Protein backbone atom coordinates (compact mmCIF):
# COMPACT_ATOMS: atom_id res chain seq x y z
CA UNK A 1 0.00 0.00 0.00
CA UNK A 2 1.14 3.53 -0.74
CA UNK A 3 0.08 4.39 2.80
CA UNK A 4 3.43 3.10 4.03
CA UNK A 5 4.98 6.36 2.85
CA UNK A 6 5.12 8.69 5.87
CA UNK A 7 6.89 11.79 4.57
CA UNK A 8 8.45 14.42 6.84
CA UNK A 9 7.91 14.31 10.58
CA UNK A 10 7.28 17.65 12.31
CA UNK A 11 8.72 17.63 15.82
CA UNK A 12 7.05 19.04 18.92
CA UNK A 13 10.08 21.05 19.98
CA UNK A 14 10.05 22.97 16.71
CA UNK A 15 6.48 24.20 17.17
CA UNK A 16 5.76 24.44 20.91
CA UNK A 17 7.21 27.29 22.93
CA UNK A 18 8.17 25.15 25.95
CA UNK A 19 7.55 21.63 27.22
CA UNK A 20 4.74 23.13 29.36
CA UNK A 21 2.70 24.59 26.51
CA UNK A 22 -0.17 22.33 25.47
CA UNK A 23 -1.49 24.55 22.67
CA UNK A 24 0.06 26.62 19.88
CA UNK A 25 -1.23 28.32 16.73
CA UNK A 26 0.69 28.06 13.46
CA UNK A 27 -0.62 30.85 11.24
CA UNK A 28 -0.36 30.20 7.52
CA UNK A 29 -1.30 33.46 5.79
CA UNK A 30 -0.62 32.28 3.15
CA UNK A 31 -0.21 28.52 3.29
CA UNK A 32 2.44 27.55 0.73
CA UNK A 33 2.77 24.22 -1.02
CA UNK A 34 3.94 21.79 1.69
CA UNK A 35 5.08 18.18 1.16
CA UNK A 36 3.69 15.03 2.73
CA UNK A 37 4.21 15.09 6.51
CA UNK A 38 2.96 13.93 9.90
CA UNK A 39 3.51 15.19 13.45
CA UNK A 40 4.21 14.40 17.08
CA UNK A 41 1.00 16.32 17.91
CA UNK A 42 -2.63 16.71 16.81
CA UNK A 43 -4.06 19.75 15.07
CA UNK A 44 -7.31 21.47 14.19
CA UNK A 45 -7.06 23.05 10.72
CA UNK A 46 -9.43 25.89 9.81
CA UNK A 47 -9.38 27.42 6.31
CA UNK A 48 -10.23 31.13 6.12
CA UNK A 49 -9.95 31.95 2.42
CA UNK A 50 -8.33 31.02 -0.91
CA UNK A 51 -8.14 27.46 -2.15
CA UNK A 52 -5.83 24.48 -2.47
CA UNK A 53 -5.63 20.71 -2.71
CA UNK A 54 -5.36 19.00 0.68
CA UNK A 55 -4.18 15.39 0.38
CA UNK A 56 -5.07 13.73 3.67
CA UNK A 57 -4.18 10.05 4.05
CA UNK A 58 -4.21 9.74 0.25
CA UNK A 59 -7.72 11.23 -0.04
CA UNK A 60 -7.90 14.55 -1.97
CA UNK A 61 -9.95 17.49 -0.69
CA UNK A 62 -10.36 20.70 -2.66
CA UNK A 63 -10.39 23.11 0.27
CA UNK A 64 -11.56 26.69 0.60
CA UNK A 65 -13.14 28.98 3.22
CA UNK A 66 -14.94 27.14 6.00
CA UNK A 67 -13.27 23.75 5.61
CA UNK A 68 -12.18 22.31 8.96
CA UNK A 69 -10.14 19.18 9.69
CA UNK A 70 -9.29 17.31 12.89
CA UNK A 71 -5.87 15.90 12.00
CA UNK A 72 -4.24 13.36 14.31
CA UNK A 73 -0.55 12.69 14.86
CA UNK A 74 -0.87 9.43 12.92
CA UNK A 75 -2.29 11.09 9.81
CA UNK A 76 -0.26 12.06 6.75
CA UNK A 77 -1.18 15.11 4.72
CA UNK A 78 0.16 17.68 2.28
CA UNK A 79 -0.91 20.88 0.49
CA UNK A 80 -0.70 21.28 -3.27
CA UNK A 81 -2.03 23.61 -6.00
CA UNK A 82 -2.56 26.44 -3.51
CA UNK A 83 -3.93 29.85 -4.50
CA UNK A 84 -4.10 32.63 -1.90
CA UNK A 85 -4.79 29.90 0.67
CA UNK A 86 -5.03 31.16 4.25
CA UNK A 87 -5.52 28.84 7.22
CA UNK A 88 -4.65 28.39 10.86
CA UNK A 89 -3.30 25.20 12.42
CA UNK A 90 -4.26 24.93 16.08
CA UNK A 91 -1.72 22.49 17.47
CA UNK A 92 -2.28 20.61 20.72
CA UNK A 93 -0.72 17.79 22.75
CA UNK A 94 -3.43 15.71 24.38
CA UNK A 95 -1.45 14.46 27.35
CA UNK A 96 -0.58 18.03 28.35
CA UNK A 97 -4.22 19.18 28.54
CA UNK A 98 -5.27 19.64 32.17
CA UNK A 99 -8.81 21.03 32.04
CA UNK A 100 -11.57 18.58 32.91
CA UNK A 101 -13.33 18.34 29.54
CA UNK A 102 -14.45 15.62 27.16
CA UNK A 103 -11.51 16.28 24.85
CA UNK A 104 -11.93 13.01 22.97
CA UNK A 105 -15.40 14.06 21.83
CA UNK A 106 -14.61 17.74 21.30
CA UNK A 107 -11.36 17.08 19.42
CA UNK A 108 -11.86 13.70 17.72
CA UNK A 109 -8.74 11.64 17.22
CA UNK A 110 -7.64 9.24 14.52
CA UNK A 111 -9.80 6.54 16.11
CA UNK A 112 -12.75 8.04 14.24
CA UNK A 113 -13.12 7.51 10.48
CA UNK A 114 -11.68 10.31 8.40
CA UNK A 115 -15.13 11.21 7.07
CA UNK A 116 -16.15 12.13 10.63
CA UNK A 117 -13.20 14.49 11.05
CA UNK A 118 -13.87 16.78 8.07
CA UNK A 119 -16.49 19.46 8.63
CA UNK A 120 -17.51 22.86 7.29
CA UNK A 121 -18.21 26.18 8.98
CA UNK A 122 -20.58 28.90 7.81
CA UNK A 123 -19.89 32.62 7.99
CA UNK A 124 -21.28 33.12 11.49
CA UNK A 125 -19.29 30.23 12.90
CA UNK A 126 -16.11 31.38 11.18
CA UNK A 127 -16.44 34.92 12.54
CA UNK A 128 -17.13 33.70 16.07
CA UNK A 129 -14.31 31.16 16.11
CA UNK A 130 -11.75 33.42 14.46
CA UNK A 131 -12.03 35.90 17.32
CA UNK A 132 -11.02 33.13 19.75
CA UNK A 133 -8.25 31.87 17.46
CA UNK A 134 -6.77 35.37 17.25
CA UNK A 135 -6.79 35.60 21.05
CA UNK A 136 -5.16 32.17 21.33
CA UNK A 137 -2.50 33.19 18.81
CA UNK A 138 -1.38 35.91 21.21
CA UNK A 139 -1.79 33.98 24.45
CA UNK A 140 0.05 30.82 23.37
CA UNK A 141 3.28 32.79 22.89
CA UNK A 142 3.63 33.08 26.68
CA UNK A 143 4.71 30.38 29.11
CA UNK A 144 3.69 31.68 32.54
CA UNK A 145 1.21 29.56 34.49
CA UNK A 146 -1.74 31.89 33.91
CA UNK A 147 -1.14 32.07 30.16
CA UNK A 148 -0.90 28.29 29.93
CA UNK A 149 -4.32 28.00 31.57
CA UNK A 150 -5.81 30.77 29.43
CA UNK A 151 -4.49 29.11 26.27
CA UNK A 152 -6.10 25.83 27.21
CA UNK A 153 -9.35 27.61 28.08
CA UNK A 154 -9.35 29.28 24.66
CA UNK A 155 -8.77 25.91 22.99
CA UNK A 156 -11.78 24.57 24.88
CA UNK A 157 -13.91 27.50 23.70
CA UNK A 158 -12.79 26.96 20.10
CA UNK A 159 -13.55 23.23 20.32
CA UNK A 160 -17.00 23.91 21.77
CA UNK A 161 -17.82 26.57 19.19
CA UNK A 162 -16.61 24.32 16.38
CA UNK A 163 -18.92 21.56 17.63
CA UNK A 164 -21.81 24.04 17.73
CA UNK A 165 -21.35 25.62 14.30
CA UNK A 166 -19.91 22.85 12.17
CA UNK A 167 -21.93 20.90 9.64
CA UNK A 168 -21.21 17.99 7.33
CA UNK A 169 -19.90 18.97 3.87
CA UNK A 170 -22.82 17.17 2.23
CA UNK A 171 -25.54 18.32 4.64
CA UNK A 172 -28.68 20.03 3.30
CA UNK A 173 -28.67 23.79 3.06
CA UNK A 174 -29.28 25.50 6.37
CA UNK A 175 -32.37 27.68 6.61
CA UNK A 176 -30.45 30.57 8.18
CA UNK A 177 -27.33 30.25 6.03
CA UNK A 178 -25.72 33.28 4.43
CA UNK A 179 -25.78 33.53 0.65
CA UNK A 180 -22.19 32.35 0.27
CA UNK A 181 -22.74 29.42 2.62
CA UNK A 182 -25.85 28.37 0.72
CA UNK A 183 -23.95 28.48 -2.56
CA UNK A 184 -21.06 26.41 -1.14
CA UNK A 185 -23.50 23.79 0.18
CA UNK A 186 -25.33 23.65 -3.14
CA UNK A 187 -22.07 23.14 -5.04
CA UNK A 188 -20.95 20.33 -2.73
CA UNK A 189 -24.29 18.64 -3.38
CA UNK A 190 -23.92 18.99 -7.17
CA UNK A 191 -20.87 16.84 -7.89
CA UNK A 192 -22.87 14.31 -9.90
CA UNK A 193 -25.68 16.58 -11.07
CA UNK A 194 -25.77 19.71 -13.23
CA UNK A 195 -25.60 23.05 -11.41
CA UNK A 196 -27.06 26.22 -12.90
CA UNK A 197 -25.79 29.28 -11.07
CA UNK A 198 -28.29 31.73 -12.56
CA UNK A 199 -31.22 29.47 -11.66
CA UNK A 200 -29.84 29.06 -8.13
CA UNK A 201 -29.67 32.84 -7.67
CA UNK A 202 -33.13 33.34 -9.12
CA UNK A 203 -34.59 30.66 -6.84
CA UNK A 204 -33.17 32.34 -3.72
CA UNK A 205 -33.58 35.93 -4.93
CA UNK A 206 -29.84 36.61 -4.84
CA UNK A 207 -27.92 39.03 -7.02
CA UNK A 208 -25.91 36.79 -9.34
CA UNK A 209 -23.33 39.50 -10.01
CA UNK A 210 -22.58 40.30 -6.36
CA UNK A 211 -22.58 36.64 -5.28
CA UNK A 212 -20.26 35.68 -8.11
CA UNK A 213 -17.89 38.50 -7.15
CA UNK A 214 -17.92 37.62 -3.45
CA UNK A 215 -17.34 33.94 -4.19
CA UNK A 216 -14.26 34.78 -6.27
CA UNK A 217 -12.97 37.13 -3.57
CA UNK A 218 -13.27 34.50 -0.82
CA UNK A 219 -12.15 31.38 -2.67
CA UNK A 220 -9.86 32.70 -5.39
CA UNK A 221 -11.85 30.72 -7.98
CA UNK A 222 -14.88 31.21 -10.16
CA UNK A 223 -17.98 29.15 -9.36
CA UNK A 224 -17.52 26.78 -12.36
CA UNK A 225 -13.81 26.31 -11.55
CA UNK A 226 -14.55 25.44 -7.93
CA UNK A 227 -17.23 22.94 -8.92
CA UNK A 228 -14.88 21.35 -11.43
CA UNK A 229 -12.21 20.98 -8.74
CA UNK A 230 -14.72 19.33 -6.40
CA UNK A 231 -15.62 16.88 -9.15
CA UNK A 232 -11.99 16.11 -9.95
CA UNK A 233 -11.22 15.43 -6.28
CA UNK A 234 -14.16 13.04 -6.15
CA UNK A 235 -12.87 11.37 -9.31
CA UNK A 236 -9.45 10.87 -7.71
CA UNK A 237 -11.10 9.19 -4.74
CA UNK A 238 -13.22 6.89 -6.93
CA UNK A 239 -10.27 5.94 -9.12
CA UNK A 240 -8.22 5.11 -6.06
CA UNK A 241 -10.75 3.08 -4.11
CA UNK A 242 -13.43 1.82 -6.52
CA UNK A 243 -13.44 -0.30 -9.66
CA UNK A 244 -15.97 1.48 -11.89
CA UNK A 245 -15.07 2.09 -15.50
CA UNK A 246 -13.61 5.46 -16.44
CA UNK A 247 -16.95 6.28 -18.06
CA UNK A 248 -18.84 5.49 -14.86
CA UNK A 249 -16.44 7.59 -12.80
CA UNK A 250 -16.91 10.47 -15.22
CA UNK A 251 -20.70 10.22 -14.94
CA UNK A 252 -20.60 10.03 -11.13
CA UNK A 253 -18.53 13.21 -11.13
CA UNK A 254 -20.77 15.26 -13.39
CA UNK A 255 -18.99 14.74 -16.73
CA UNK A 256 -21.29 13.58 -19.52
CA UNK A 257 -18.40 12.89 -21.92
CA UNK A 258 -15.73 10.50 -20.65
CA UNK A 259 -13.22 11.72 -23.25
CA UNK A 260 -13.66 15.29 -22.07
CA UNK A 261 -13.31 14.08 -18.47
CA UNK A 262 -9.99 12.41 -19.36
CA UNK A 263 -8.70 15.61 -20.97
CA UNK A 264 -9.68 17.76 -17.97
CA UNK A 265 -8.22 15.24 -15.50
CA UNK A 266 -4.92 15.14 -17.40
CA UNK A 267 -4.75 18.93 -17.54
CA UNK A 268 -5.30 19.15 -13.78
CA UNK A 269 -2.99 16.37 -12.57
CA UNK A 270 -0.61 15.65 -15.44
CA UNK A 271 -1.74 12.04 -15.76
CA UNK A 272 -4.70 10.27 -17.37
CA UNK A 273 -7.44 8.73 -15.17
CA UNK A 274 -6.39 5.20 -16.15
CA UNK A 275 -2.72 5.89 -15.42
CA UNK A 276 -3.65 7.44 -12.06
CA UNK A 277 -5.64 4.33 -11.13
CA UNK A 278 -2.77 2.08 -12.24
CA UNK A 279 -0.45 3.70 -9.70
CA UNK A 280 -2.50 2.23 -6.88
CA UNK A 281 -3.17 -1.10 -8.54
CA UNK A 282 0.60 -1.53 -8.75
CA UNK A 283 1.12 -1.07 -5.02
CA UNK A 284 -1.85 -2.98 -3.61
From Swiss-Prot:
The keyword Transcription applies. Residues 181-279 form the HTH araC/xylS-type domain. GO terms for biological process: positive regulation of DNA-templated transcription; rhamnose metabolic process. Residues 198-219, 246-269 bind DNA. SMART domains: HTH_ARAC. The record marks 248 as: Interaction with sigma-70. Keywords: Activator, Cytoplasm, DNA-binding, Repeat, Rhamnose metabolism, Transcription, Transcription regulation. GO terms for cellular component: cytoplasm. It is found in: Cytoplasm. Its main location: cytoplasm. InterPro entries: AraC-bd (IPR003313), AraC_XylS_family_regulators (IPR050204), Homeodomain-like_sf (IPR009057), HTH_AraC (IPR018060), RhaR_RhaS-like_N (IPR047220), RmlC-like_jellyroll (IPR014710), RmlC_Cupin_sf (IPR011051), Tscrpt_act_RhaR (IPR023699). Disulfide bonds: none annotated. PROSITE patterns: HTH_ARAC_FAMILY_2. Activates expression of the rhaSR operon in response to L-rhamnose. Binds DNA as a dimer. This is HTH-type transcriptional activator RhaR.
